[in-house]
Amino acid sequence: MTVVDDIYELMTTKTTDESVDIEAEIDKFGESVKSLMRNEFSPETPRDDRKLRLSNIGRDDRFLWHHYNDTSSEEEIQGHTYVKFMYGHLIEEMLLFLCRMAGHTITDEQKVCEVEGITGHMDCKIDGVVTDIKSASPYGFKKFK
């Protein structure tokens, strides 16, 4: 079985392994969501966008050149886009909660990583496997086919 199968089984049966502390996991999930909302609605700390980040690895050279040389006029991010970002963060927290409830081990959440001088964060490791959690619309999934 896979993590996905285990989550579906959890949702169908509503039963967890004896080793899972249900109340502790619910509390942890609640604290994670509260932290997310605090970050969302606290004054923003400016970010240095001139630094190459791990999330840019694999991007087209032309894109990176234009990004770091500020050749485009920056569009203002609209409200619905901020909602999409928040939705993605909430989905990540919910999936990590469900993984824990299904008996999987989650470690290294948002761990700072450095590869050849480039810094980034991993989402987590699930059962020792580096995992990046993403949400996407049906349109977003089509581009990977």
Language-model region placement:
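Metal-dependent nuclease catalytic cores that hydrolyze phosphodiester bonds in DNA/RNA
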Residues: 1-130, 137-144
